[in-house]
A protein has these predicted regions:
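Conserved class I S-adenosyl-L-methionine
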Residues: 1-47, 52, 56, 73-76, 142-170, ...
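Conserved SAM-binding motif I beta-strand of class I
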Residues: 64-68
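A conserved beta-strand element that flanks and buttresses the S-adenosyl-L-methionine
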Residues: 115
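A short glycine-rich, Lys/Arg-flanked "PGG" loop and its adjoining helix->strand segment in the class I
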Residues: 127-142
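Short alpha-helix
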Residues: 181-199, 205
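A C-terminal cap/extension of S-adenosyl-L-methionine-dependent methyltransferases
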Residues: 204-258
Length: 258
């Protein structure tokens, strides 16, 4: 069977150095750092792709498992790991498989934290995946999801001057992203509800890419530190975070009641 994600993986990997992707990974990494247990905690990155989030975590001493259904993505992760020092390589494990079946694929292992960034938007219903993420966590473990913000789909086309598209997006639940794929958005309220159903307490949510999402394939400039700080501050305060392109939600699995 071929890799259904091959073309998407190619487009995603080729966009890795542009501003919007740099901001995505830097901002989610900063938000995540406020909630993760200390290294060498064990983390599983569901849909972790080429290791954009996992490899920096491994550099900090975390033991990270990437599980991804795309052989193309995992091959890219291997290439990136080959450029790292031996200690970083030893702390990253690559596994082929889907998030929904990750608990089974990983032999029932549980982890201190589970990441699922940029995956929910490709699913018709996020709740089965969120239940699967919860199953991967030990009690008290931290879950981090990154989803498309359903309440802000009109922002990008409007800021790009595509006003008819923006008008249509005001009541839409889906749009076509930069990678050319039509994907679905979630609201913060719906994600909070899905967390509760899965036995996860929501801790904090952040908006990712408030002021820069309409800039297309622009590369980072010398002002990147200022842009990062602006996006970070806006992404954790109202009303700005509510119009961000992406929602970064962090929660903790509730302890087992004795």
């Amino acid at each position: 069977m071929g890799d259904p994600f091959h073309d998407l993986a190619e487009r995603y990997n080729s966009s890795g150095e542009i501003l919007r992707q740099v901001l995505r990974h830097e901002l989610t990494g900063r938000g995540l750092a406020a909630h993760l247990p200390g290294a060498p905690a064990r983390i599983v990155d569901v849909g972790g792709g080429a290791g954009q989030q996992a490899i920096p975590l491994s550099r900090r001493g975390y033991e990270v498992t990437i599980i991804d259904p795309s052989p193309k993505m995992l091959a890219e992760a291997r290439k990136r790991l080959a450029r790292e020092e031996a200690g970083v390589r030893r702390r990253v494990r690559l596994v082929g498989g889907t998030g929904e079946r990750a608990h089974e694929t990983l032999g029932g292992e549980t982890f201190d934290s589970v990441l699922c960034h940029g995956v929910l938007m490709y699913l018709e219903d996020p709740r089965p995946m969120i239940h699967a993420l919860s199953a991967l966590l030990r009690p008290g473990g931290v879950v981090s999801v990154l989803a498309k913000n359903a309440t802000a789909l009109a922002m990008r086309p409007a800021l790009e001057g595509r006003y008819q598209d923006a008008l249509c997006s005001l009541k839409a639940e889906r749009d076509r992203g930069r990678l050319g794929v039509i994907t679905r958005g979630d609201t913060v309220e719906d994600l909070y509800g899905a967390f509760r159903e899965a036995g996860v307490e929501a801790l904090q949510w952040y908006g990712v890419r408030v002021f820069t999402d309409h800039l297309g394939d622009r590369m980072p400039g010398e002002d990147l530190p200022e842009v990062l700080e602006l996006e970070w501050e806006a992404g954790r305060s109202e009303p700005y975070r509510s119009v961000a392109r992406l929602i970064h939600l962090v929660g903790r699995k509730k302890p087992i009641q004795g």
